[in-house]
Amino acid sequence: EVDMRCKSSKECLVKCKQATGRPNGKCMNRKCKCYPR
């Protein structure tokens, strides 16, 4: 999980790619969830 606020899952794709190296993630409860870990 990335502690970043989001409005859409598209915002998380960039953040997840930075965090995990893969642009896989969803915006849930206004926070980004990245997977797989």
UniProtKB/Swiss-Prot annotation:
This protein's domain notes: Has the structural arrangement of an alpha-helix connected to antiparallel beta-sheets by disulfide bonds (CS-alpha/beta).
Keyword set includes Transcription: no
Function: Reversibly blocks voltage-gated potassium channels (Kv1.1/KCNA1 (Kd=79 uM), Kv1.2/KCNA2 (Kd=547 nM) and Kv1.3/KCNA3 (Kd=492 nM)).
Record keywords, A-Z: Disulfide bond, Ion channel impairing toxin, Neurotoxin, Potassium channel impairing toxin, Secreted, Toxin, Voltage-gated potassium channel impairing toxin
Record-linked InterPro entries: Scorpion_toxin-like_sf, Scorpion_toxinS_K_inh
Coiled-coil residues: none
Native source species: Parabuthus transvaalicus
GO cellular component: extracellular region
Site (Aromatic residue of the functional dyad) location in chain: Y35
Name assigned to this protein: Potassium channel toxin alpha-KTx 1.10
Broad class of where this protein is predominantly found: secreted
Any GO molecular function: ion channel inhibitor activity
Record flagged with keyword Cytoplasm: no
Protein family according to the UniProt entry: Belongs to the short scorpion toxin superfamily. Potassium channel inhibitor family. Alpha-KTx 01 subfamily.
